[in-house]
Regions:
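N-terminal capping/lid subdomain adjacent to the active-site entrance of alpha/beta enzymes
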Residues: 1-194, 198-207, 211-216
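Cleft-lining beta-strand/loop regions that shape enzyme active-site pockets
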Residues: 219
Length: 219
């Protein structure tokens, strides 16, 4: 089985409401750009991966750059190769475009998806087997000017079954403490609280804020 084509599908996914955080490059968004990658083989089996083009800490990726990296650098290296030699292929990509992690993630996911389809097993079987029957997930609450709106978002997530609430922080530490207090008082010990400043705080300010958040029992 050989790789014969790599397909890239750009998407722009709109948010239902604006999403605000403290990331230095982009504090508020109305949508997110994603790239779906499908790897095709000569046996008709294909695998799908996905990545984001999000200008935030650790990444300045845009869709065009992701597509060009995959089409112009990755695809020539992958064509004719066995998609089952995953570690070898990823090492080739890393050497050709060092630290292009977002593009590489989509290709890597597609290779694992393809291999799992070929062997007729879930991907976790290729990664050493199942560790647990389910995985708990959380919901992220955007920074809002209206505190009640943040509580309402968290309540909506709770009603949908989420028990881990992650609040965005880092723009105004005083507001962060007020929100943490309000959400903890609203839910009591029914949820676990987490916080994410998206690189919006330096080390000294982060320590000061964390100290103030201690009474609200963050994970």
């Amino acid at each position: 089985m050989k790789i014969v084509r790599i397909e890239t599908i750009p998407l722009r996914i709109p948010f239902r409401t604006p999403f605000t955080m403290a990331a230095p490059h982009e504090k508020s968004r109305n949508s997110i750009d994603c790239l779906v990658v499908r790897i095709h083989t000569d046996e008709g089996i294909s695998g799908i991966g996905e990545t984001q083009a999000w200008r935030r800490q650790g990444s300045l990726e845009v869709l065009l750059n992701l597509q060009r990296t995959i089409r112009e650098i990755y695809e020539p290296l992958l064509l004719g190769q066995s998609p089952l030699d995953i570690n070898h292929l990823l090492s080739l990509l890393d050497a050709a475009a060092y630290k292009s992690l977002y593009a590489q993630a989509a290709v890597g996911d597609a290779l694992y998806d393809l291999a799992a389809r070929f062997h007729g097993v879930p991907v976790y079987r290729l990664l050493g087997g199942k560790c647990r029957d389910n995985v708990e997930v959380g919901m992220c609450v955007s920074i809002e000017n209206d505190m009640q709106a943040m509580i309402d978002r968290a309540q909506k997530a709770y009603d949908a079954g989420y028990r881990h609430i992650r609040i965005k922080i880092g723009i105004d530490p005083e507001d962060d403490v007020k929100v943490a207090k309000a959400i903890r008082e609203h839910f009591g010990d029914r949820v676990s609280l987490r916080a994410d400043a998206n690189a919006g705080l330096d080390y000294p300010n982060a320590l000061r804020l964390l100290k103030k958040l201690e009474p609200y029992d963050f994970d």
